[in-house]
Regions:
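Post-J-domain flank of DnaJ/Hsp40 co-chaperones
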Residues: 38, 44, 104-118
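Residue-level detector of alpha-helical recognition elements and their boundaries
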Residues: 36, 71, 101-105
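Hydrophobic alpha-helical segments and helix-packing faces
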Residues: 79, 83-86, 116
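The canonical J-domain HPD catalytic loop and its flanking helix-turn segment that engages Hsp70
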Residues: 38-43, 54-77, 89-95
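Conserved acidic
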Residues: 48, 75-78, 82
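Conserved alpha-helical segments that form or flank metal/cofactor-binding pockets of metalloenzymes
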Residues: 83-108
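N-terminal J-domain/J-like co-chaperone modules of DnaJ/Hsp40 proteins
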Residues: 3-63
């Protein structure tokens, strides 16, 4: 399901996960997303870890809180949250077990204590 959102600054509408507004270029207010959406990846198990790493460094360079230190308090806060979420998402996707768990959650499945999928 694609999330519909509104930019906190210019009020333009957008769909899906984006770090920045395409209209006013401000960092977006964080919205609920999963690790795959954070990186713009398809929800599938097989991923290119080298590309993931390169994309991680590229995105962190754009959203790192140090780049927002002299901007509004909203932008500074949003960059801190995005940066933290991206760090967590990167760790999830690097690890095969946590990546599998993230996929199962996305598809509405869980693994119980007896290792059966429900």
């Amino acid at each position: 399901m694609i999330t519909k959102c509104v930019c906190w600054n210019c009020k333009s509408q957008y769909e899906g996960f984006q770090f920045f507004c395409l209209v006013c270029k401000k960092i977006h207010k964080p919205v609920s997303s999963n690790a795959f959406e954070q990186f713009g990846l398809e929800h599938k198990f097989s991923i290119d870890l080298k590309k993931l790493e390169m994309n991680y460094y590229f995105l962190q360079d754009r959203i790192h809180p140090d780049k927002f230190i002299n901007l509004s308090s909203e932008e500074s806060l949003y960059s801190q949250i995005h940066s933290s979420n991206l760090n967590s998402s990167y760790e999830i996707l690097k690890n095969v077990v946590s990546r599998c768990d993230e996929l199962l959650k996305f598809f509405g499945q869980t693994i119980d204590n007896e290792n059966t999928i429900s």
